[in-house]
């Protein structure tokens, strides 16, 4: 089996009522996407992905070039091909590694379909407990230090460490 194509479809939900940002990027719109990995045997792996212009360029550019023609079941090998020699540095960083994550998830979906196995089984089984984390602390217009402290204290009060 060989990878023949990688596609990325996206959808935009428009502008956010309340944009937010972290130390790196400001988020003003909402949307999402799906990466699809197609093979010569008709098996297609899919996974959710953002569909920003940067992510689109990474997935349909450098990553696609490295994976088309390869065996999709060799996920470790393909991960190394994607990781080494990202777009501008010796190793992957930032949006590039986020793009890799979507492709990696689609490869696992493809492998599960090809082998007739659920991905959880391919990944080694199940666990009775999973450590969760709270993502927050984003900046917003009108949100100051007191509001940030209140938000983060709420996560701690809910049991997040």
Model region roles, listed by residue range:
Residues 20-23, 119, 150:
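Glycine-rich, charged/polar anion/phosphate-binding loops
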Residues 26-29, 123-126, 156-157:
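Solvent-exposed alpha-helices and their adjacent loops that cap or buttress functional pockets
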Residues 5, 38-114:
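Metal- or metallocofactor-binding catalytic centers and their adjacent structured scaffolds
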Residues 98, 105, 117-119, 128, ...:
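Conserved structural scaffold segments of CAZyme catalytic domains across common CAZy folds
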Residues 1-46:
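Structured beta-strand/loop patches that form or line metal/cofactor-binding pockets in enzymes
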Residues 41, 115-141:
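N-terminal small/glycine-rich loop or linker at the start of catalytic domains
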Residues 1, 101, 158:
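Structured loop/turn residues at beta-strand edges in well-structured enzyme cores
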Residues 129-161:
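Metal-dependent enolase-superfamily TIM-barrel catalytic cores that perform enediolate-based chemistry
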